[in-house]
């Protein structure tokens, strides 16, 4: 299987997929005061198949049962990723209102019912506990995605401290939003967008570098100085009652709901490869998978007749989704800017970018 970088290295490399952010962030937000939360919405083209895989011990989700391949509804109109813990699920009401206004959803007598699964992160300790997303956040994130698409704006997804990633933490460091994409030799493109808010670290405390050595080379990172590594090792982990990394992987391949679910399951390995530990009892790690069906592709691998004809394609797309999600995690952490005094990777390890100045907040 040959993987090639897609043009924007973004989930929006998949035609019809649109991403919008909305957040409120006070410049003086602190741990316990001010606004520091937001949402990220993924809009899909009509006829997009959806599935989900949930591995964390404390998930906060919406409409995930509906995505079980055994159930009747196949298509998804949008996916909500939100801060605010369970309160943030209120943002889905705004997403549904926006979709209804644009006549998207299951057509029923008298109107439409939009299908909007979603998941949330626990970020209530960053900023004021009572400052959390509302329905208006979801509506405005949808509008931002739509405006970027129809207005001819740059379709590249904003990363770092934006949208649902504003209050996110990755272990002891600032987390955020990341995205990545890959095009397969067989034709389909696979992309991911992730909100990194993990209990586990994305950095090896012994080296100051990512766990995945492949990513060290890809992002041209260098070993930080011993002083910077020592400073990082002294940071105490803010082990909280709830964390969670949530994301969406998408492809333009044609997949059934069951195949889509297998892709979501495979993509979870991208979290395990870049975050240690992952899928803990304190996380609610949830990954949605979307297949727009714009590209008809057949995997090159032969499979026994007794197996599903999708097996080879599922394997290829799943492996690519795993890689995309892993890369997106590191993009999120490298792009993050400090909020409420939470240190960033760039601030703690300037030596990883060839700079020898001391660490701190970015």
From Swiss-Prot:
It is found in: Cell membrane. Its EC number is 3.4.11.-. The chain crosses the membrane at residues 32-52, 75-95, 106-126, 148-168, 176-196, 287-307, 329-349. It comes from the Bacteria. One of its GO terms (molecular function) is aminopeptidase activity. It is a multi-pass membrane protein. The keyword Heme does not apply. InterPro entries: ArgJ-like_dom_sf, Peptidase_S58_DmpA. Keywords: Aminopeptidase, Cell membrane, Hydrolase, Membrane, Protease, Transmembrane, Transmembrane helix. Aminopeptidase. This is Uncharacterized aminopeptidase ML1167. It comes from Mycobacterium leprae (strain TN). The lineage of its organism: Bacteria, Bacillati, Actinomycetota, Actinomycetes, Mycobacteriales.
């Amino acid at each position: 299987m040959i993987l090639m970088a897609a043009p924007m290295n973004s989930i929006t490399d998949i035609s019809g997929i649109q991403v919008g952010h909305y957040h409120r962030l006070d410049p003086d937000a602190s741990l316990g005061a001010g606004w520091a939360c937001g949402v990220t919405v993924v809009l899909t083209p009509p006829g997009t198949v959806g599935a989900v895989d949930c591995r964390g011990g404390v998930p906060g989700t919406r409409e995930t049962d509906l995505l079980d391949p055994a159930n009747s509804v196949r298509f998804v109109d949008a996916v909500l990723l939100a801060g605010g813990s369970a309160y943030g699920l209120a943002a889905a009401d705004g997403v549904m209102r926006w979709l209804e206004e644009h006549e998207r959803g299951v057509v029923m007598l008298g109107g439409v019912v939009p299908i909007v699964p979603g998941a949330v992160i626990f970020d209530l300790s960053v900023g004021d506990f009572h400052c959390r997303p509302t329905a208006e956040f979801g509506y405005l994130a949808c509008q931002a995605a739509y405006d970027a698409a129809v207005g001819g704006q740059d379709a590249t997804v904003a990363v770092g401290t934006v949208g649902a990633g504003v209050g996110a933490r990755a272990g002891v460091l600032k987390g955020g939003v990341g995205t990545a994409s890959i095009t397969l030799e067989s034709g389909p493109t696979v992309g991911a967008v992730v909100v990194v808010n993990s209990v586990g670290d994305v950095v090896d405390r012994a080296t100051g570098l990512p766990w995945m050595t492949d990513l060290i080379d890809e992002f041209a990172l260098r070993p930080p100085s011993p002083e910077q590594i020592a400073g990082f090792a002294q940071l105490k982990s803010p082990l909280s009652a709830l964390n969670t990394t949530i994301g969406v992987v998408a492809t333009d391949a044609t997949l059934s709901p069951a195949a889509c679910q297998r892709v979501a399951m495979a993509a979870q390995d991208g979290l395990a490869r870049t975050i240690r530990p992952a899928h803990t009892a304190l996380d609610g790690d949830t990954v949605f998978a979307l297949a727009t069906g714009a590209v008809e592709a057949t995997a090159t691998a032969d499979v026994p007749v007794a197996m599903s004809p999708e097996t080879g394609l599922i394997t290829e797309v799943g492996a690519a989704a795993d890689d995309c999600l892993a890369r997106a995690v590191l993009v999120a952490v490298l792009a993050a800017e400090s909020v409420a005094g939470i240190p960033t990777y760039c601030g703690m390890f300037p030596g990883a970018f060839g700079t020898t100045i001391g660490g701190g907040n970015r």
